[in-house]
């Protein structure tokens, strides 16, 4: 059974320097060190705002132009610093859970003309290897069943619902277009059915 292991206060956010609480968990079957970042005691809210964010070293840490992961994380932190909410930061590197080295191999193939899905398939992987059952278990450990989910990804909605989480509302993020990631975002929209508004 998943339960809260430890919690500590800290400040986060490039612009906001917002107070938050960082939580670790016991009982995660994968052994991965997933964490929760909680703003304004959001777990006490009737229907908290929640985002699941898969670790992306190149985007989150190095601000790579190949994806929009860092921008999505920064956007969510700023929103939740103001409104409250929970970020479940999932240690499944790469948007498809490939692992870092396989992700680098996929980048190489993308440089040769493949889109992100074609590159992953060429390496022998399915479109999306991530699964979100442990995210649902983390929410359950916090006593949360009903959420407002911040996502553009229909797979996240489906996986959480299949694991007993009731999604009251879906809140989209912006399409963070920049030099180098337009093809990536459009592949997610056309192939992965992600819901983007490219006019924003």
Swiss-Prot record:
Residues engaged in binding Zn(2+): 56, 67, 69
Keyword Kinase: no
Cofactor descriptive note: Binds 1 zinc ion per subunit.
CC per GO annotation: cytosol
CDD domains: GTP_cyclohydro2
Cofactor(s) it depends on: Zn(2+)
Catalytic activity: GTP + 4 H2O = 2,5-diamino-6-hydroxy-4-(5-phosphoribosylamino)-pyrimidine + formate + 2 phosphate + 3 H(+)
EC number: 3.5.4.25
UniProt entry tagged with the keyword Protein transport: no
Similarity annotation: Belongs to the GTP cyclohydrolase II family.
NCBIfam families documented for this protein: PRK00393.1
Protein name: GTP cyclohydrolase-2
Species of the source: Photobacterium phosphoreum
């Amino acid at each position: 059974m998943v339960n809260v292991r430890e919690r500590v206060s800290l400040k986060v956010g490039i612009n906001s320097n917002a107070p938050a609480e960082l939580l670790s968990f016991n009982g995660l079957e994968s052994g991965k060190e997933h964490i929760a970042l909680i703003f304004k005691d959001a777990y006490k809210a009737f229907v908290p705002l929640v985002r699941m964010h898969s670790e992306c070293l190149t985007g989150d840490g190095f601000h790579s132009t190949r994806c929009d992961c860092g921008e999505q994380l920064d956007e969510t932190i700023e929103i939740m610093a103001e409104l409250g909410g929970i970020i479940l930061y999932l240690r499944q590197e790469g948007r498809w859970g490939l692992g870092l080295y396989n992700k680098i191999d996929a980048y190489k193939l993308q440089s040769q003309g493949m889109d992100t899905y074609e590159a992953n398939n060429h390496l022998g992987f399915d479109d999306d290897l991530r699964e979100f059952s442990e995210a649902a278990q983390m929410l359950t450990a916090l006593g949360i069943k009903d959420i407002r989910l911040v996502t553009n990804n229909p797979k996240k909605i489906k996986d959480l619902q299949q694991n007993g989480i009731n999604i009251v509302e879906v809140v989209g993020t912006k399409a963070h277009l920049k030099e180098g990631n337009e093809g990536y975002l459009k592949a997610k929209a056309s192939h992965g059915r992600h819901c983007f508004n490219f006019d924003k």
